[in-house]
């Protein structure tokens, strides 16, 4: 696997593959990889001739009081895992390569409405940072296909919307959430949890399952959500949000809409966890 911080080297390697008519899949990450990331790489290898990955802890998507400095960096272990999974080219830029004029002078990409709610409301500017860096990475790598985990459901929808709105010739594929045996969605931030907190955190998925079951049985949506919030509180969570939305566009649920998604964000101690569950009522 080739590892480089240089945009030009990425483009030269991509050009070499393109001249042979070969296809490119791309998996952007922030590193500290787990099985969910590796699943994306392996799936990418099935869908294209070559797999490109990136590791970049993007400062633009972190708020002033968030965990940018504390975010785990495990580059050497990540490189081994990516190579073993089938990645052939790894882009590891520094912030001054991605934002040479600094973030304040950076042209940015913002997806309105869908990016202003849920996590966007809780973390102002977060999705502007995500959309900007993903758009830049897409322009550098110019893949045929890019893969993202469905655990970050709102992020996936924002990226799909951005690609459609900007007419980028890239297929965006969402891959199912990989979970631990307890049901807890795999996340780089799970490493912040103590053993006891990790056990408690499994209640997040259980609560979403209970909400889904209640709604399918005809329960009031508001009541199902209120019961779910109380279950989270009783299990030691501090809920940020727990909402039912239309799975197609994250709009509020109205009569006649059957493809739904439960979106959850809650704190276990100081660690903010997110998850979601799509279902048909």
Swiss-Prot record:
GO molecular function per UniProt: ATP binding; pantoate-beta-alanine ligase activity
List of catalytic residues: 37 (proton donor)
Main location: cytoplasm
Bridged cysteine pairs (disulfide): none
Alphabetic keyword roster: ATP-binding, Cytoplasm, Ligase, Nucleotide-binding, Pantothenate biosynthesis
Something else known: The reaction proceeds by a bi uni uni bi ping pong mechanism.
Name under which the protein is recorded: Pantothenate synthetase
The organism of origin for this protein: Shewanella woodyi (strain ATCC 51908 / MS32)
Gene from which this protein is expressed: panC
């Amino acid at each position: 696997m080739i590892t480089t911080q240089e945009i030009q080297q990425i483009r030269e390697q991509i050009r070499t593959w393109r001249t042979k008519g070969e296809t490119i899949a791309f998996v952007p990450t922030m590193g500290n990889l787990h099985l969910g990331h590796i699943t994306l790489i392996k799936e990418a290898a099935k869908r294209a001739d070559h797999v490109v990955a990136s590791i970049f802890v993007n400062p633009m998507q972190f708020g002033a009081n968030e965990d940018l400095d504390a975010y785990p960096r495990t580059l050497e272990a990540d490189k081994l895992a990516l190579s073993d999974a089938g990645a052939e080219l790894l882009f590891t830029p520094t912030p001054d390569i991605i934002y040479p004029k600094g973030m304040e002078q950076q042209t940015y990409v913002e997806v309105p409405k869908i990016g202003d709610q849920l996590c966007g409301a809780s973390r102002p500017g977060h999705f502007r940072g995500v959309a900007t860096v993903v758009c830049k990475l897409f322009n550098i790598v110019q893949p045929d296909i890019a893969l993202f985990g469905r655990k970050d459901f709102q992020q996936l929808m924002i990226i799909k919307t951005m690609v459609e709105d900007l007419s980028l010739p890239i297929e965006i594929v969402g891959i199912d959430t990989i979970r631990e045996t307890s049901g807890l969605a795999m996340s780089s931030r799970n490493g912040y949890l103590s053993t006891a907190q990790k056990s408690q955190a499994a209640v997040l998925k259980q609560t979403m399952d209970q909400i889904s079951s209640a709604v399918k049985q005809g329960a009031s949506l508001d009541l199902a959500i209120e019961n779910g919030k109380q279950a989270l509180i009783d299990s030691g969570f501090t809920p940020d949000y727990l909402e039912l939305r239309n799975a197609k566009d994250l709009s509020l649920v109205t009569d006649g809409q059957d493809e739904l998604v439960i979106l959850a964000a809650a704190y276990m101690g100081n660690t903010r966890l997110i998850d979601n569950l799509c279902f048909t009522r």
